[in-house]
Amino acid sequence: MAIAFQDVNTTSLGAITSDLNKAARPTVLVFDSGVGGLSIYQEIRQLLPDLHYIYVFDNEAFPYGEKSEEFIVERVVQIVGAIQQKHPLTIVVIACNTASTVSLPALRERFSFPVVGVVPAIKPAAKLTRNGVVGLLATRATVNRSYTKELIEKFATGCRIESIGSAELVELAEIKLHGGKVSPDILKKILKPWLGMKKPPDTVVLGCTHFPLLAEELVQILPDGTRLIDSGVAIARRTAWLVKHQNNLVCTSADSLAYCMKVNTDTDALIPVLQEYGFSKLEKLIT
């Protein structure tokens, strides 16, 4: 059985109690194409429980992995702009590896608030591996992007990187969050290239924010001692630092809420899940 492991510098992190008046809190927007960004939101909220959160998922264009870079950039900028018209934003977290690798420059040029992105945790994985073999589990788009290859060249030149690109894992994570069951046989089929290796990865980077939602299932299938690493804790720490060092915070007393881009039976089924995550309601975003 594998072991779940999230951050090379992880210690026992307690929640940071805000010095701000709890009736007036700065707003953090967490954005993803689907529900995978909830794994990032969960880490941020654990560290900063007193903030006002907005979660937006673009279920109309989900998944982003198969979309063009131009489409993603235009889409993300448009959605963030629509939220800005409704809420005073302190920080935006793009909790999607695919969107982060292509849209951050455009977002930072357009908006004045800080924008935090998510990238595969190649650097800590390269430091943690014991056998020199690191697995990258991500979407095909993330695996093939030049940005990911640059991370590998910069931080993991002494390692062998074994990559698996899978859109099916994204769908499985969505199914799980909607209350469905994940088939171990399907996971074994996806992970088959690693399971048959004489020297498989001992450290696996979860390079999509959906994949931590499947950590429980993945550790049952990967070899004993395999470490799973994602970027959640690092993103939470970065967000906490930015909140602390922001000037002229515009605060709100509103409840945390979620937005989607289209409403259907799937989003109806998500409402109780989102409420468990602390969101008072789910609305359709009009752009």
UniProtKB/Swiss-Prot annotation:
Keywords on record: Cell shape, Cell wall biogenesis/degradation, Isomerase, Peptidoglycan synthesis
Keyword Repressor included in the entry's annotation: no
Listed PROSITE patterns: ASP_GLU_RACEMASE_1 (PS00923), ASP_GLU_RACEMASE_2 (PS00924)
Catalytic activity: L-glutamate = D-glutamate
Catalytic residue list: 96 (proton donor/acceptor), 208 (proton donor/acceptor)
Binding site for substrate: 32-33, 64-65, 97-98, 209-210
Keyword Cell wall biogenesis/degradation: yes
Gene Ontology terms for molecular function: glutamate racemase activity
Any single biological process term in GO: cell wall organization
EC class: isomerase
NCBIfam families, sorted: glut_race, PRK00865.1-1
Function: Provides the (R)-glutamate required for cell wall biosynthesis.
Protein name: Glutamate racemase
